[in-house]
Amino acid sequence: MLIRVEIGIDAALLRRAFESDAEAQLVHDLREDGLITLGLVATDDEGQVVGYVAFSPAIVQGEELQWVGMAPLAVDENYRGQGLARQLVYEGLDSLNEFGYAAVVTLGDPAFYGRLGFEQAAHYDLRCRWPGTESAFQVHRLADDALNGVNGLVEYHDHFNRF
């Protein structure tokens, strides 16, 4: 298994990693608009894409604070349960930390993301625009001071509003 930065030719192979075409279309739209801060793929021994994670800009209370949103994260069903999602997330967090980003937000299972160092964003008075997601909205600080004095609405790009 190899985890690497995505390249243009991977686009056609991504649909295999997603459960629905909506996620693949989201990635396509983000890429077309130059909004993927970092995209990583996991490939099998034959070079087929079997996992994917994207990070794109997120703003807090209308301000650019070097935060990114992590979505989508997907692993081909034949490769689930092998720690591939965890590896993709860790690789992304490491790279974003090296690039100087301050924090990463995501929506997902608190038990899974909690094991990866994410915390409920609500503990820091952070929220996203989608009602009923309070327990699923997570934040991971990359910079020690990323959450100092920061609170309010965290927004992903409008492309995410279709979900």
What do the PLM-derived regions correspond to, one by one?
Residues 37, 133-138:
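Short hydrophobic/aromatic beta-strand or adjacent loop that forms the aromatic wall/cage
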